[in-house]
């Protein structure tokens, strides 16, 4: 009787699929952004593509039974172009000697690939956090310095009011909070427990999803400043993500897409000169904030389209003094007209903040 070993070769596609799912499970903030892939960018100049955004027009009123002395007013229709580009190549590269591969580790799938996937995921997460922190905000709201739960809830209500007045989408609204906000809200009865389904179970996003408050899904991030929070709609930022193809010179490799659309490439080869096996995991990425012209009603009751573009899809909140932190439309050539036309010049009636401790 002949003894034989049945070796089962694991396909690169299967390893890459495992790695991309591991990477996707580590993401929190990037999953809150609108995603676009590589097909929109192929052939684009300077790695940039202009995404067409429909224009907006004001509505006017032609007086009933007027003497027809004045003609209709014609407004110019202008479509906008949002320039988005890939600006990053997040990667993790490592190598194993023959001795390490045979004696020290259990293989690429159990040790190395998971570590590489988590490293790339952290890079994507940090990029999304930076996009949040460096973005432009037409509305910033202070929630006081005392850590009072009612002040925090008031700030969230004020953020909701601002988004509503700016005409932001009510679909997929999320409140991304730092650890100090998390501590305050955990002790508040206003936080409704989240019902996490199978699609997000056992992931960093599921762990970060606390529940709902005032119409927002509340997601905690340890990577943003503890005293900051961001009220977002699902299209506040664009997350560009794609995996490059596999070069013919690679010994093994695959490009994969997770169930949630996160792309990643894994390459493996062997260097005979140094007798080491090399593994590289990478993904292309970029982030872009979305700004819009604002349509508002002027003093004559006429709809007007703003000259400048503003952030009307997200609001920044901070555990800081209300009087000095809360700002409505602090920048822009027609900021005063826009703020007045939207009714967003100050904290709305009905919201009263408790004074900060002395």
Model-derived features with residue positions:
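Short, solvent-exposed loop/turn elements at domain surfaces
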Residues: 58-62, 184, 228
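Short alpha-helical segments and helix-capping/turn motifs at coil-helix boundaries
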Residues: 31-38, 160-161, 263-265
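N-terminal "assembly arms/tails" that initiate or stabilize quaternary assembly
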Residues: 1-86, 326-358
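Extended, compositionally biased alpha-helical segments that mediate assembly or anchoring
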Residues: 2-7, 252-358
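Long, contiguous amphipathic alpha-helices that act as assembly "spine/axial" helices in icosahedral shell
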Residues: 51, 79-141, 166-179, 218, ...
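Extended serine/threonine-enriched, polar tracts that run as long, contiguous segments within proteins
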Residues: 178, 210, 216-269
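Extended, solvent-exposed, turn-rich assembly/linker loops in the middle of proteins
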Residues: 136-217
């Amino acid at each position: 009787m002949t003894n034989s070993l049945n070796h089962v070769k694991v396909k690169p596609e299967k390893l890459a699929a495992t790695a991309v799912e591991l990477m996707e499970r580590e993401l929190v903030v990037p999953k809150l952004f609108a995603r676009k892939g590589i097909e929109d960018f192929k052939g684009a100049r300077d790695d940039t593509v202009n995404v067409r955004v429909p224009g907006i027009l004001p509505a006017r009123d032609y007086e009933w039974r007027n003497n027809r002395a004045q003609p209709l007013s014609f407004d110019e229709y202008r479509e906008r172009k949002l320039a988005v580009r890939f600006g990053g190549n997040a990667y993790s590269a490592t190598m194993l000697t023959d001795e390490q591969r045979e004696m020290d580790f259990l293989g690429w799938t159990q040790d190395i690939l998971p570590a590489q996937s988590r490293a790339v995921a952290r890079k994507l997460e940090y990029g999304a956090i930076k996009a949040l922190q460096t973005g432009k905000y037409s509305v910033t709201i202070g929630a006081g310095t005392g850590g009072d739960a009612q002040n925090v809830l008031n700030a969230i209500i004020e953020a909701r009011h601002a988004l509503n007045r700016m005409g932001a989408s009510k679909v997929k609204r999320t409140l991304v909070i730092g650890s100090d906000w998390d501590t305050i809200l955990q002790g508040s009865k206003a936080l409704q427990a989240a019902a996490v389904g199978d699609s997000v179970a056992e992931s960093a996003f599921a762990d970060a999803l606390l529940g709902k408050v005032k119409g927002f899904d509340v997601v905690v991030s340890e990577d943003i400043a503890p005293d900051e929070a961001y009220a977002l709609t699902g299209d506040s930022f664009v997350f560009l993500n794609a995996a490059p193809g596999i070069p013919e010179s690679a010994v093994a490799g695959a490009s994969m897409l997770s169930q949630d659309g996160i792309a990643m490439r894994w390459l493996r080869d062997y260097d005979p000169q140094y007798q080491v096996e090399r593994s590289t995991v990478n993904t292309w990425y970029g982030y872009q904030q979305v700004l819009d012209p604002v349509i508002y009603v002027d003093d004559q009751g006429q709809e007007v389209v703003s000259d400048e573009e503003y952030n009307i899809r997200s609001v920044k909140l901070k555990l800081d003094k209300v009087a000095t932190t809360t700002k409505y439309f602090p920048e822009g050539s027609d900021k005063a007209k826009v703020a007045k036309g939207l009714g967003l010049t100050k904290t709305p009636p009905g919201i009263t903040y408790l004074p900060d401790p002395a």
